[in-house]
């Protein structure tokens, strides 16, 4: 699983997962994982499994306004991407209005979405650089 960043569209919606500007770092805290996200970016979730195994992922998003969104289960493969929340206008993006993601597959984990400054303070790691469209994945094969 990876969290692929991109510049947040002003509309707050995308038709499909945009080109990735790179994976966001994830750090472990005492009880959860931390995901740094600035106000000008959003992310989609990349999914993969190894060795021909199939996995079912259950995902719950908890927003800062108190709203909770439970997704239908996602079977990997064939699914490779969770672009956002389907809402009839495409996908509402995962952005800084998201507080938590709860992920359940073989085990459960919670991912807390925090600002870059808070991420650096809580982890001692450098905050990621601001998103830059010059770093967009162009479709070439990776090694």
Region annotations inferred by a language model:
Residues 1-143:
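Intrinsically disordered, low-complexity segments enriched in small/polar residues
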């Amino acid at each position: 699983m990876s969290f692929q960043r991109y510049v947040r569209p002003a509309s707050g919606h995308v038709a499909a997962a945009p080109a990735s500007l790179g994976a966001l770092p994830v750090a472990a805290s005492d009880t959860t994982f931390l995901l740094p996200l600035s106000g000008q970016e959003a992310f989609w979730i990349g999914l993969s499994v190894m060795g021909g195994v199939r996995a079912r992922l259950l995902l719950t998003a908890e927003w800062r306004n108190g709203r909770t969104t439970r997704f239908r289960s996602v079977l990997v493969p064939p699914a490779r991407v969770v672009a956002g929340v389907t809402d009839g206008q495409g996908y509402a993006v995962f952005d800084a209005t998201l507080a938590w993601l709860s992920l359940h597959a073989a085990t459960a984990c919670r991912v807390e979405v925090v600002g870059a400054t808070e991420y650096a303070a809580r982890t001692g790691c450098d905050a990621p650089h601001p998103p830059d469209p010059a770093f967009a994945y162009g479709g070439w094969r990776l090694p």
